[in-house]
């Protein structure tokens, strides 16, 4: 059992930086997620949305809503309201011309808010798969 240090922020992300231009990193991220059984259910172009709604300019930035249906079904069977926390968001954002940051929400941290211990194993599985997807990104540089 781990305990948070008072005053310390709990990490809620899994992240990596890749030496790929943004568009190629988005493509590689989609493929890496698919290799781990995740489908992308939603896609929000945050840069375009902020430009259209509040005329703000930010670097290219997309939010992919990733879901592994088998895990979602197991989670819903154990916690009817879990849909409020689905899908797992994966963010791809430009960090210059040739570097891109890829971040995913940590499913284990996310389900901790439910205080439902039955979700821990499901969240751990999702975390392992997201870790593997992000770890595979450097291999997609070629």
Which residue stretches match the model-derived regions?
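Terminal, regulation- and interaction-focused segments at domain boundaries
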Residues: 7-36, 135, 139
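Short glycine-enriched loop/turn motifs at secondary-structure junctions
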Residues: 10-12, 34, 56-59, 95
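Conserved active-site and cofactor/substrate-binding residues in soluble primary-metabolism enzymes
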Residues: 20, 24, 45, 125
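Short glycine-/small-residue-rich flexible loop motifs, especially phosphate/cofactor-binding loops
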Residues: 30, 47-48, 131
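Compact, glycine-rich, soluble single-domain proteins
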Residues: 39-41, 45-91
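Beta-strand/loop substructures that line and gate deep hydrophobic ligand-binding cavities in soluble
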Residues: 89-116
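Well-ordered alpha/beta subsegment
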Residues: 112-142
């Amino acid at each position: 059992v781990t305990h948070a240090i008072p005053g310390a922020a709990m990490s809620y992300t899994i992240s990596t930086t890749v030496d790929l231009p943004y568009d190629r990193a988005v493509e590689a991220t989609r493929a890496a997620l698919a290799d781990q059984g995740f489908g992308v259910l939603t896609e929000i172009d945050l840069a375009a949305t902020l430009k259209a709604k509040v005329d703000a300019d930010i670097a290219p930035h997309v939010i992919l809503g990733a879901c592994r249906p088998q895990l979602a079904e197991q989670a819903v069977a154990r916690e009817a309201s879990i849909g409020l926390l689905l899908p797992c968001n994966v963010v791809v954002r430009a960090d210059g011309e040739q570097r891109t940051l890829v971040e995913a929400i940590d499913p284990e941290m996310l389900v901790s808010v439910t205080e439902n211990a039955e979700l821990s194993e499901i969240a751990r599985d999702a975390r392992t798969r997201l870790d593997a997807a992000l770890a595979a990104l450097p291999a997609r540089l070629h």
